[in-house]
Each structure stands twice: as structure tokens, then as C-alpha cells.
């Protein structure tokens, strides 16, 4: 079993416990995170470049009062993917599907597509 596959649960645990530093530790210094959603379509996605920007993004997300669960987590030596389900206290839900490329056990490129339910749905 490779290091990536044996340690992948640490990424799941970091996401579910809202541990921004634990999530950020999975990224290479020069990583690129691209997020697509209703407000940020393929022509104008949100893009975070480098560990500093990605870390700030996760500190914001992990600092929010919401529940996170990770499902369908798969990994290989060269990549990983998972579905993340989030729920805010008001009942609003977010589902995010992500795929990422790994080099030397670190995420170098990630694309995430996220959608929301209406509040309380």
C-alpha cells in the first residue's frame, strides 16, 4: 500500500473536523485550486494559486459554522477524488465534487464543482 492511499483518511479527517491546517498540509507550495459553481462558471472560475492563497481559503471555509462529511473518497499514486457534503445551521446544503492531481503525495492541481440547495431544503 502506498503512503498516499494509507494516509488518505487524514485528509478526510481534516475536512470533517474543519482543520484548515490539516487540509492545507496536503497541498504543494505551487498548487492551483479551481472552483466552479453557479457564480463562477468555466469562463470565470475562482482560482487560488499557491499554498498561501489555498490556506487562506481553507481557513475561511473551516472557520464557518457548518458540518462537513466526505464520501466516495478514492485515491491512486497520481490523484484523488471525493464528494463533500456540507450543511449550515439554517439548513442550507452544499455538495462539492473534487478531483486532484498528486505529485510526491501532494496536491498540485485540484478542480472542485459545487452546488447549493435553497435554505432549509
Residue ranges and their predicted role:
Residues 22, 26-76:
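A solvent-exposed, acidic/Ser-Thr-rich amphipathic alpha-helical stretch
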Residues 1-25, 29, 119-121:
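Short, low-complexity N-terminal intrinsically disordered segments enriched in polar/charged residues
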Residues 56-121:
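A beta-strand edge to alpha-helix "cap/lid" segment located at domain peripheries
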Residues 4, 8, 41-42, 54, ...:
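Hydrophobic aliphatic residue packing
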Residues 17, 21, 53, 108:
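Short, flexible micro-motifs
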Amino acid at each position: 500500500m502506498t503512503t498516499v492511499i494509507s494516509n488518505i483518511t487524514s485528509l478526510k479527517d481534516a475536512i470533517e473536523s474543519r482543520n484548515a491546517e490539516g487540509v492545507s498540509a496536503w497541498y504543494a507550495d505551487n498548487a492551483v485550486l479551481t472552483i466552479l459553481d453557479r457564480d463562477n462558471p468555466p469562463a470565470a472560475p475562482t482560482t487560488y494559486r499557491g499554498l498561501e492563497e489555498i490556506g487562506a481559503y481553507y481557513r475561511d471555509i473551516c472557520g464557518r459554522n457548518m458540518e462537513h462529511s466526505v464520501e466516495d473518497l478514492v485515491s491512486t499514486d497520481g490523484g484523488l477524488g471525493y464528494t463533500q457534503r456540507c450543511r449550515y445551521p439554517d439548513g442550507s446544503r452544499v455538495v462539492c465534487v473534487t478531483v486532484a492531481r498528486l505529485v510526491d503525495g501532494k496536491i498540485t492541481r485540484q478542480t472542485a464543482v459545487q452546488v447549493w440547495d435553497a435554505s432549509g431544503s
